[in-house]
């Protein structure tokens, strides 16, 4: 029986005192044995955490005791082992970094579409369907008919839209992302750029995979997640992908059969672009990671690459 609850959460809400919230929030996480990373900014809160059932419930009881977060929603999945090494609360300018001044989901967002209604919307031939995630995420799974912007970070999304789409020609735009936060902010940007009918998937891909029966699904592949599970399948069970610590790309079972795959050091996506200095550093890093795992200790060398994309 799985014992670890993984909770993905976010809410766009004005938090003028977000700096002062950091310490009590961090203490709540630590007191309840909850691990993972939460981001705080004036525009809201975002992150993924994991812990026992009691620990996660205690965290959300604390969050919802603040009237501004009383209706915060989250998505849960489950795993057998703790997927995060550390507990962090970071202060940021944005809880998901778009880098465009004036974009404020607290003031305007597109139309939310529930998971049960998503298939009907994206089956409309007049709807432009855009995957707002990074290129390596799209490569392992996306919705049927979705456009891949091939962006490496969310900061590249505005320029992609400017270069490829015109509000006068593209009347209906639907967007999606892992948990809903990126496409919600993207919808605010799109409205500000003049697009009139903008839709986004409430709860993101994770909510869709949770609620829509697989036989009715228009999702193809796995969904990348920002923890040590790497990917999840349609029933939110852990997928078969691993992740290369050197380049952060997901690696499939086939990739792991390659002569260029060395756990923690290189994979078919990056083996020919790494310097010997980088390889040497990766070897030492992997050695320390394995030692830490054997001792059941936190990752000893800073940021876990599986969490680093949370902000991008």
UniProtKB/Swiss-Prot annotation:
Name the EC number(s). Answer: 1.14.-.-
Q: Name one GO biological process term.
A: tRNA modification
Which InterPro entries does the protein's record reference?
Rhodanese-like_dom, Rhodanese-like_dom_sf, TrhO, TRHO_N
Q: Which CDD domains match?
A: RHOD_YceA (cd01518)
| Molecular function via GO | oxidoreductase activity, acting on paired donors, with incorporation or reduction of molecular oxygen
- The organism's superkingdom is given as Bacteria
What job does this protein perform?
Answer: Catalyzes oxygen-dependent 5-hydroxyuridine (ho5U) modification at position 34 in tRNAs.
- Name listed for the protein in its UniProt record: tRNA uridine(34) hydroxylase
Tell me what gene encodes this.
Answer: trhO
């Amino acid at each position: 029986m799985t014992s670890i609850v993984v909770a993905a959460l976010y809410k766009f809400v004005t938090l003028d005192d977000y700096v002062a919230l950091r310490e009590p929030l961090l203490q709540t996480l630590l007191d309840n044995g909850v691990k993972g990373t939460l981001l705080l900014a004036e525009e809201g809160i975002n992150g993924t955490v994991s812990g026992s059932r009691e620990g996660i419930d205690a965290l959300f009881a604390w969050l919802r005791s603040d009237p501004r977060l009383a209706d915060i929603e989250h998505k849960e999945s489950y795993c057998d082992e703790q997927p995060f090494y550390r507990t962090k609360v970071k202060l940021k300018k944005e809880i998901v970094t778009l880098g465009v001044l004036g974009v404020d989901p607290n003031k305007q967002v597109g139309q939310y579409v529930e998971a049960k209604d998503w298939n009907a919307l994206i089956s409309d031939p007049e709807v432009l369907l855009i995957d707002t995630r990074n290129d390596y995420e799209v490569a392992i799974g996306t919705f049927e008919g979705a456009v891949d912007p091939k962006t490496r970070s969310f900061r590249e999304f505005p320029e992609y839209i400017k270069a490829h789409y015109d509000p006068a020609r593209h009347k209906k735009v639907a967007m999606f992302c892992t948990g809903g936060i990126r496409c919600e902010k993207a919808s605010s940007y799109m409205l500000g750029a003049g697009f009139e009918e903008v839709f986004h998937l409430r709860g993101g891909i994770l909510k869709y995979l949770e609620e829509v029966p697989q036989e009715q699904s228009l999702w193809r592949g796995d969904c990348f997640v920002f923890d040590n599970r790497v990917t999840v399948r349609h029933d939110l069970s852990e997928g078969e992908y691993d992740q290369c610590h050197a380049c952060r790309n997901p690696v499939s079972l086939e990739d792991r059969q390659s002569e260029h795959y060395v756990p923690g050091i290189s994979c078919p996506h990056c083996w020919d672009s790494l310097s010997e200095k980088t390889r040497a550093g990766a070897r030492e890093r992997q050695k320390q990671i394995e030692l830490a795992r054997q001792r059941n200790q936190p990752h000893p060398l800073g940021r876990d690459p599986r969490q680093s994309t949370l902000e991008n």
